[in-house]
Curated annotation (Swiss-Prot):
Location within or outside the cell: Plastid, Chloroplast
Matches recorded under PROSITE patterns: RIBOSOMAL_S15
Annotated transmembrane regions: none
GO BP of this protein: translation
GO molecular function annotation: structural constituent of ribosome
Superkingdom assignment: Eukaryota
Protein name: Small ribosomal subunit protein uS15c
SUPFAM superfamilies: S15/NS1 RNA-binding domain (SSF47060)
Matches recorded under Pfam families: Ribosomal_S15 (PF00312)
Keyword terms: Chloroplast, Plastid, Ribonucleoprotein, Ribosomal protein
Matching Gene3D superfamilies: S15/NS1, RNA-binding
Length: 90
């Protein structure tokens, strides 16, 4: 896993942003999602972790929707910085 790249980003985020901001929360959820994904590659039948992953994905999706409504520029920057796909519009 690419932990070192995220450590430098998280230290910048902690200095610049509030920990309660939507951007910081999306960043933390993304780290948790990546950790759980690598865990589930080894433990495929860990259904509680799968449920936790789905819950975190939903939370991140709601936060990203909120951020895209409030500030489109910061939303685009965050998605490109974290290398997240943009959700499909229904």
């Amino acid at each position: 896993m690419v932990k070192n790249a995220f450590i430098s980003v998280i230290s910048q985020e902690e200095k610049e942003e509030n920990k309660g901001s939507a951007e910081f929360q999306v960043f933390n959820f993304t780290n948790k999602i990546r950790r759980l994904t690598s865990h589930l590659e080894l433990h495929r039948k860990d259904y509680l972790s799968q449920r936790g992953l789905r819950k975190i994905l939903g939370k991140r999706q709601r936060l990203l929707a909120y951020l895209s409504k409030k500030n489109k520029v910061r939303y685009k920057e965050l998605i490109s910085q974290l290398d997240i796909r943009e959700p499909k519009i229904r």
